[in-house]
Amino acid sequence: MPKPIKRLSSHKKKRVIFKGIIQIKASFNNTIVTVTNSQGQVITWSSAGACGFKGTKRSTPFAAQIATENAIRTLISQGMKQAEVMISGPGPGRDTALRTIRKSGLVLHFVRDVTPLPHNGCRPPKRRRV
């Protein structure tokens, strides 16, 4: 039986990106960080669940920090220098994720809050009784 051939490098294309958009979705249960180029094509993404946090630990600010560091590490290796940040959601990880991006050394053009707010749209779910 022949031995399997070891792959020397990954099949993933090496891209050089100078400017991109970092989108942070901070929900009450998880924090998802997606990085796109200016056309909207996804370059990399990371989330608290994908970084190994399970259950209620996903909703912590520390999990959001690790997920953001994971995404930014990939960006810097691909040569990104400038970024725009769009934050949506009311979760506990939104401030920590933004702090982590500021410490990373990327030049931020703007930080925008794009949390969707209803103008009295759908009826909300009933209140929880615990």
Curated annotation (Swiss-Prot):
PANTHER family for this protein: 40S RIBOSOMAL PROTEIN S14/30S RIBOSOMAL PROTEIN S11 (PTHR11759)
Keyword Methyltransferase listed: no
Subunit structure: Part of the 30S ribosomal subunit.
Keyword set includes RNA-binding: yes
Family, per entry: Belongs to the universal ribosomal protein uS11 family.
Gene this chain is encoded by: rps11
Gene3D superfamilies xref list: Ribosomal protein S11
One Pfam family, short name: Ribosomal_S11
Coiled coil: none
Protein name as it appears in the record: Small ribosomal subunit protein uS11c
Protein's organism: Psilotum nudum (Whisk fern)
